[in-house]
């Protein structure tokens, strides 16, 4: 048994009370966390142990609130244990489909339409321009030409944003990479809500299209399903 799991169960007695004694752990993919599929006395679970370097960059209080709201909507795996200080998270293990569903773009579009139009009040706000400014500081010297181009894009975007249309912030996942979209029997469930916040709908929509590498046809199917999810979602992403 990995030492970090032994330490987590030692330092957090509720883990043993909920899961039972840990018996076997299989590492899973994860960038900002160590994730294990855990066989324990009371069943099988996913156990997330955050890496130390993420302590100052992720608001665990906000994540816990947003995850609970998303789970109540049926869009996320419900937590059975979450520590709002350390970020330790446990969910029940689920069966993940061996192959990506052919209609994943439609499923994901419908799910996002439901999330964005739910009216849930997520903690935190995510603004693309602020993210860009923060990233820009570290990339300025290495990628001067690319940064200049991005500056032009953001100046154009800002001019459009200030042309009279109010910013629309909706509950957003914020990190829709393929690894965070689990295809399970019954549909898609989203995991890793660490970067969730209130954001413009375009953040999740563009992120999903780019990270999943959707073709033009898949993108149309994705956006079409998004608009059909609810009447409110249709107003968030009108056809071009």
Language model feature labels by segment:
Residues 28-41, 46-47, 155-203, 217:
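Active-site acidic catalytic loop and adjacent metal/ATP-binding pocket
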Residues 202-232:
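Active-site activation/catalytic loop segments of kinase-like enzymes and analogous catalytic loops
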Residues 26-130, 137-144, 148, 166:
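ATP-binding pocket architecture of kinase catalytic cores
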Residues 232-240:
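All-alpha amphipathic helical-bundle segments outside canonical DNA-binding/catalytic cores
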Residues 52, 96, 188, 196-198, ...:
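Activation segment
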Residues 65, 177, 206:
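Active-site phosphate/pyrophosphate-handling residues
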Residues 2-19, 23, 118-174, 184, ...:
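An alpha-helical support segment within catalytic cores of ATP-dependent transferases
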